[in-house]
Amino acid sequence: MLAGLRPPPSSGAPRRFRRPLVPVIVAAALVAVVAGIVIFRGHSGSTAASGTTPSTVSQDARRQAAVGLSGLLAQSVTDRAAVNEAAVDLRGCGPSLRQDARTLARAASSRQRLLSRLGSLPGRSLLPAAMLQDLTSAWQASAQVDTDLAGWADDMITRGCHGKSRSDAHLRASYAPESQATVGKRAFASLWNPLARRYGLPTYQRNQL
């Protein structure tokens, strides 16, 4: 039969209606909300069960970073004591000039190692940035002072001092970095000591570092 001659569809055939989509969308949204609530409660419950909160974890990590820094400071105190002893002997043209030169050279190397460890200190981002910068500046200057004083000791060994120390280029070169180190250590101590007291760690004066 030709297409144009097809009889019209029977009026008795059942009609198909599309179901409205709104209830389906609303139901899907409700399912998503319920699932989100369940997940959130589960997460909150697991956090409560473990007894930790983000702030607690942050405080613990900050304390660990402070403990790590305290260990570096203890090494610095040991170095400073050895440097002071060598400097006293040098100023008096003492009997241990060669040992003084070695002590000062070792102290300079130790400062550099401390700087490297400070730069990679775990959790350093949790400590005050200004405090770490003050300590970095102070240790850099102290390393330069130790190097200059070691050179001064070598000069006295070579030229002799005859019971009295003599100023030379190496000694004069140490003056500027020594002042810089003093400023940095004082600023560092003012920030470190309150933090150390909070965590029960040793406090320091600038002349100990």
Question: For the regions a protein language model found, what residue spans apply to each?
Answer:
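Low-complexity, Pro/Ser/Thr/Gly/Ala-rich intrinsically disordered linkers and tails that serve as
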Residues: 1-4
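Short intrinsically disordered, low-complexity segments
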Residues: 36-39, 52-56, 80, 109-113
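Short extracytoplasmic/periplasmic juxtamembrane "stem" segments immediately C-terminal to an N-terminal membrane anchor
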Residues: 48-70
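Alpha-helical segments in soluble extracytoplasmic regions
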Residues: 64-153, 163-209
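Generic low-polarity alpha-helical segments
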Residues: 42, 56, 123-125
